[in-house]
Amino acid sequence: MARRPKGRFIDGIVLLDKSTGMSSNFALQRVKRFFNANKAGHTGALDPLATGMLPVCLGEGTKFSQHLLDADKRYLVTAKLGERTDTSDSDGEVVQTRAIDFTEAQLLTALDFFRGETQQVPSMYSALKYQGQPLYKYAREGIEVPRESRPITVFELNFIGLEGDELTLDIHCSKGTYIRTIIDDLGEMLGCGAHVIMLRRTQVAQYPYARMVSLEQLEALVAQAHEQQIDPSILLDPLLLPMDTAVADFPEVNVPDAIAPYLMQGQAVRVPVNAGLKTDELVRITLGDIRRFVGIGTMNEDGLLAPKRLIVIHDEPAETD
């Protein structure tokens, strides 16, 4: 008999406010432990230098993490002008120092270059892989490997301020955009060089900034629960967002209770849907009058709703540590 996973079955999404200096995986494991969750996964790593929103999916919520990985992001970034580093951030070594000599008009013109749809060559100090190995491992050995440019979209690039040699920007961008690369390229366009000294992710998809919670806050709630001699879940679980918020922008298809069992067994079913849905378009599936979220699917060529990823409804508790 297969061993049940350790931890409890708890489904949802935590909007973690990651602190600087820690890896995203370290933060993920801490969240998983605080919630005593049987399963957890994050939705796109933040560099150790970076802070801010890191959605952590728990339990069945991990099935929808890819959709948050693909979502738009927003960042607040501060760049130090006049210095270029080998990593394009303050964790690297300064490789060039130049005078800062540009006008406000030149800065605004340079910023406009990055708005809209462009091509970006990823930094060597990234987790993208070349022949099975992350680029940053090659970079640490002083090896430069070929990288293809990738299409990105900068929906907004707002000038926040320039104080001395520090430039602050607000950037709303598509998935796969490297803010460090934007700053490095901007520094070269201005002729002075630049690197990131502060990077904070302020938004993922449409998740509210105000719902973020730090590891310190989670730890304090666990300590409070122990003092009150109550289960930590009583204080922690209200922080969870429903897992269907990861696919909130998908059109909803509601399945009547009478045919729900067939769908949950993986069968394609015929349901009344909006005529505007396209074949193979991803949809959010709900059941019955209470519109309970059970997963995502697509409409096939025969007009049937085909389940693609369904949640598991657990009847038994998982093992505890």
From Swiss-Prot:
EC number: 5.4.99.25
Gene3D superfamilies: Pseudouridine synthase, PUA domain
Biological process annotations from GO: mRNA pseudouridine synthesis; tRNA pseudouridine synthesis
Pfam families for this protein: TruB-C_2, TruB_C_2, TruB_N
GO MF terms, alphabetically ordered: RNA binding; tRNA pseudouridine(55) synthase activity
Coiled-coil residue spans: none
Mitochondrion as UniProt keyword: no
Domain of life: Bacteria
Catalytic activity: uridine(55) in tRNA = pseudouridine(55) in tRNA
UniProt keyword Isomerase present: yes
Catalytic site positions: D47 (nucleophile)
Keyword line: Isomerase, tRNA processing
InterPro entries: PsdUridine_synth_cat_dom_sf, PsdUridine_synth_N, PUA-like_sf, PUA_sf, tRNA_psdUridine_synth_TruB, tRNA_sdUridine_synth_fam1_C, TruB_C
Family under the similarity heading: Belongs to the pseudouridine synthase TruB family. Type 1 subfamily.
Function, as annotated: Responsible for synthesis of pseudouridine from uracil-55 in the psi GC loop of transfer RNAs.
Family matches, as NCBIfam families: TruB
UniProt protein name: tRNA pseudouridine synthase B
Organism, as annotated: Shewanella baltica (strain OS155 / ATCC BAA-1091)
